[in-house]
Amino acid sequence: VLAICRGLQVMNVFLGGTLWPDVSQGGFDGGLHRDGEGGEPPVGDIAHWTEMEGSEFEVTSHHHQGVRELGRDLEVLSKSSDGMIEAVKHKSLPWFAVQWHPERTEEGLGRALPREWLRKELQRCTTK
């Protein structure tokens, strides 16, 4: 499963997590998460997961809700500079989710993310 934006939120709630009804309630900078032109670079382990150089990438982020409590068996891969969870993966299932829209990012992580996810899943399936 590759979940995007609301898909991350649905996955999190399905696994028992909770959401901030509005990111401003959690003390997050709402402006960082409503940028339609390319948003705040996430920080964290997303670069390691994709095997790309660097640890910060510009992403297109436009949401007013976000993960408050992480669902069971989810692991945080990336957070924005204000601490909002931006990417997660399931610890044992082939589930990966991002809060931003990689399809709206023309280069860098936007192009690499779907390709790397598919490559890792094909590798996982063929080694079993």
What kind of feature is each model-predicted range?
Residues 1-18, 101:
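Catalytic nucleophile loop
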Residues 2, 60, 77, 96-98:
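Hydrophobic/aromatic beta-strand patches that form the interior of the parallel beta-sheet core
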Residues 2-4, 42, 50, 94, ...:
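Generic low-polarity alpha-helical segments
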Residues 15-87, 91, 103, 108:
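Pocket-forming structural segment of enzyme catalytic cores
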Residues 98-128:
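Acyltransferase
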